[in-house]
Amino acid sequence: MNVLIAGAGALGSLIGARLSKTRASISLFSTNREHMEAIRRGGLDIEELDGTVRNYPLKTFFEADKLPRNPDLVLVLVKTYATQTALSLVHGVCSASTVFLTLQNGIGNWERIAEIAGKEAVLAGSTAQGSTLLGPGLIRHGGNGPTYIGEPEGPASERARRLVELFREAELVAEPSDEVARLIWEKLVINVGINAITGLTGIRNGFIAEMPEATDLCRSAVEEAIIVAGSKGFPFGVEMVQRVISVARATGRNRSSMGQDVDKKKKTEIDAINGAVVRFGKEAGIPTPVNETLTSLMKVLEAQYTSQRTP
């Protein structure tokens, strides 16, 4: 199986490296030329959970016109706001039989992919793996967690089960799912309680479980998201709050993806996470003051480091 990782940042590089130990042929694609060239020259170094460093030789690409043609699978892990741009770049090298699997954060990604590739070509899922990009060619595995794969709508198909087996062959915990839409909302609720808080404060995920003030803020944001998710047909109980805190603890060494974006002064996925809760809340008449505040603060922070204007 030929697999193209579209969006080989911290998480994409981690999953690509793990999959490279299977029967599959893996290609990493990212516009981060420095990271791609470092891996091409010396392989990808992963600082493992036990502190050891393992090296993975991998094929890398930073130019779309150099990509290998006719991949069997495109694993989409770009930022939500870059989904359509990335698909327009890779779609030209794909065949009618290419399958696209999104494990991205946020809501609406599989629909965006389907607009370009067709709904029948898309699988979706959720992963709790955590990874931090430490520098070109170097990542830290920040936490283990399951990956769920299935059809965007309906029960898990045979093709989804085949990909689950591939992930298991790579020693990644994976399960087929008949409820992908619910899992995507569940991941959204988890991200709501972790990403913006870590991005705004500079802390690692684990501090959310250790600092009472951070825990309380996480709880308030998640409680709003639970109510909004229920209005969309995905009811979660109050135990979801403790689940989010447990995820923060399990990925304690990790900086969330949003935290890493802030560290690098890059655009974040705030609109697809806390901002999505705010939008859906307004549609349903549900107040979301904590998520509104987190969203606004993140936008102010982004504007500070992305704007070319001076006060």
Task: Please place each PLM-identified region on the residue numbering.
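NAD(P)+-binding Rossmann beta1-loop-alpha1 motif at the extreme N-terminus of oxidoreductases
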Residues: 1-52
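Short, well-ordered alpha-helices that flank and scaffold nucleotide-derived cofactor binding pockets
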Residues: 17, 21, 88-92, 115, ...
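Short alpha-helical
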Residues: 34, 81-82, 107-108, 155, ...
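NAD(P)-dependent Rossmann-like dehydrogenase/reductase catalytic/cofactor-binding core
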Residues: 158, 168-169, 219-311
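Internal alpha-helical scaffold of NAD(P)-dependent oxidoreductase catalytic cores
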Residues: 92-93, 115-121, 134-187, 197-238
